[in-house]
From Swiss-Prot:
Source organism superkingdom: Bacteria
Keyword match Cytoplasm: yes
Biased amino acid composition, Basic and acidic residues: 281-293
Cellular component terms per the entry's GO annotation: cytoplasm
Modified residues (N5-methylglutamine): 233
Lineage: Bacteria, Pseudomonadati, Pseudomonadota, Alphaproteobacteria, Rickettsiales
Alphabetized GO MF terms: translation release factor activity, codon specific
Name recorded for this polypeptide: Peptide chain release factor 1
Assigned protein family: Belongs to the prokaryotic/mitochondrial release factor family.
Pfam families: PCRF, RF-1
């Protein structure tokens, strides 16, 4: 089937779904048709824009063949042809991108987890910097950033921290942030002015709803214990801390941030559900090895993806060879869009090349 035939088939399907919805269908049939209709809407808009430009180009070329035009009119026609010829490849690419298989998780909210890696206290301080950077980015996007848990070192660093980020298409924007982030800078405690290298690991998980992942009570082991603060001292006289283990997968989440055991359990279940959903999602992707070849980076938490070099004021993304000399804007102000949009574009380009 040719590209044009495929587009015509999609338009026919969209029109037929519209007629079906107008015919008064009810129940599950209506829900299914409404979902399909909504999913096709974006690509149909792009197909119509592409077809319109294609038709206008054909008309302009035919018009040009007519006799009797003065030079000024002919120049105007040729300008229009030139504009349309330049726009067609862009419009065609937009259609193809809209036709790419969608990641079901892209529209979801996300849970972000940041953990200090190699580098001791400096790594923990960097983990806190990254966590705050994502909080500012969420604020810029108008998303809701809810801190789930923070394990701090007592002097400003985070051993680990997690947050729920709610909003439209959050996961599609943040999913490429998973991996190892490396920092090169002179620690405040360094008297010799030597540059230290340390790292933190970021994991971005699509936030799963109960309809996505059904967790049976019989599959959970829930342990409670007293919360402890920095240095291990007990800060609570009640067993408010919660550790939940999902027995079939072995995934464990421990939380002690809230004074209420009930609140800790609710937050832990939210993180657990996201981790199980992400594991299932990754297993499915692994089965589709051919499509996985087209992804930007593996999304593996052990993959080094970005370096933040403070002395040089640069941030470098190693997957797309993009370096920006604006470290304060990125780290302090959360201006990540230049990296994120470039990563999305590169991912789309790789997938398009495999069509």
């Amino acid at each position: 089937m040719s590209f044009s035939d495929n587009l015509a088939k999609i338009l026919d399907k969209y029109d037929n779904l519209g007629k079906k919805l107008s015919s008064g269908i009810m129940g599950d049939e209506f829900v299914k048709a409404s979902k399909e209709y909504a999913e096709l809407e974006d690509v149909v808009v792009k197909i119509k824009e592409y077809n319109k430009a294609k038709s206008e180009l054909e008309e302009a070329n035919n018009f040009k063949l007519e006799l009797g035009f003065d030079n000024a009119t002919l120049a105007m026609i040729e300008d229009e042809i030139h504009i349309l010829e330049n726009s067609l490849p862009k419009l065609e690419r937009a259609v193809k991108i809209a036709l790419l298989p969608k990641d079901d998780a892209d529209s979801k909210s996300a849970i972000i987890e940041v953990r200090a890696g190699s580098g001791g206290e400096e790594a923990a301080l960097f983990a806190a910097v990254l966590f705050n950077m994502y909080q500012r980015y969420a604020e810029l996007k108008g998303w809701r950033f809810e801190i789930l848990a923070i394990s701090d070192t007592g002097i400003g660093g985070y051993k680990e921290a997690s947050a729920s980020i709610k909003g439209k298409d959050v996961f599609s924007k943040l999913k490429f942030e998973s991996g190892v982030h490396r920092v090169q800078r002179v620690p405040e405690t360094e008297s010799q002015g030597r540059i230290h290298t340390s790292a933190a690991t970021v994991a971005v998980l699509p936030e799963a709803e109960e309809v996505d992942i059904k967790i049976e009570d019989k599959d959970l082991r829930i342990d409670t214990y007293r919360a402890s603060g920095a240095g291990g001292q007990h800060v609570n006289t009640t067993d408010s801390a919660v550790r939940i283990t999902h027995i079939p997968t072995g995934i464990t989440v421990a939380l002690q941030d809230e004074k209420s055991q009930h609140k800790n359990k609710a937050k832990a279940l939210k993180i657990l559900r996201a981790r199980i959903y992400e594991e299932e999602r990754r297993n499915k992707e692994q089965e589709r090895a051919d499509s996985r070849r087209g992804q930007i980076g593996s999304g593996d938490r052990s993959e080094r993806i970005r370096t933040y070099n403070f002395p040089q004021g640069r941030v470098s993304d190693h997957r797309i060879n993009l370096t920006l000399y604006k470290i304060d804007e990125v780290v302090k102000n959360g201006q990540l869009d230049e990296f994120i949009e470039a990563l999305i574009a590169e991912d789309e380009a790789k997938k398009l090349s495999e069509i």
